[in-house]
Amino acid sequence: MPRTLGLISLALILAAIVSPVVSPVGTAAAAGTGVSSLIAGTPIRSVYVRPPRGAATATKPLQVLLALHGMGGSGEDFSKELVEQADKYGWLLVAPTIDYGDWTNPSVVAREDPVLIRALADYLDQLPQLTGLQTRRTVLILGHSRGAQLAHRFAEFRPDKVLAVAALSAGAYTLPQASGPQGGLSFPYGVKDLAAYAGHTFDASHFDRVQFWVGVGGQDTNAADLPRQWDSIEGTTRVQRAQAFEAAMKQLGANSVLRVFGDAKHDVTGEMRLAACAFLGSAMAPRAPHGTPLAAEPVAY
């Protein structure tokens, strides 16, 4: 979309959102006057915003669901399959379109994700002013593939802003550890030097309050799809790497569930999507005492 048209598109959708009757159907929203300064110079090309049905008469702040697509996708397309669940749970969908760089290059990831996380955090902070809708302080995040990588790293950088994460089919993880069997784990492999990227050290006390659900297809096991730099730390397939991340979460004492969908490959199936949304919906309920196992049942692998 040309940038000029993008400016017009966002102006139109925000005008619709802040009108007395909030449209239940979203429209593509791109970098506009109020948003462009927040995402200028970043790989974020546009932001799709869709309020849930009934948002115009809502008496409580809306729960934001930040939806993060994978390589080559778009926020609007990724959100289409989430609309029904967003209406069911009352989520304000926020789905950026991101022009990701080479995710197989750790140096690119180490440069790119801190920029994306800062920009998205700033955007979420400004969302009430941009839309006229009040939002809850912490957000839910659902990401697939490259988006799942960004989703869990967002929580590692800004656990204060995240209620729960559903990460589907990530190709590589930043383990919530400063070291492993082979020594120190610097970003993007671990959080040893997170202060150099986030401006603060890894906050384990806040991070272990974030509820995590990690999903992966049981047939998503093609090692050729993944960069080799993570092999010695997390394994050679998406399933092994999901297991490694889950093990690191358990070692930390964090709230985490791993679910392996036996017949699924890399695509997001309806079963995976519904399970992820059900988890995120349950995360909105009052929390049990810290350390209580989450309700979602992991699938044996």
Identify the function of each model-found stretch.
Residues 98-100, 170, 261-263:
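Active-site loop/turn elements of alpha/beta-hydrolase fold enzymes
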Residues 55-103:
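Short substrate-entry loop that stabilizes the transition state in hydrolases
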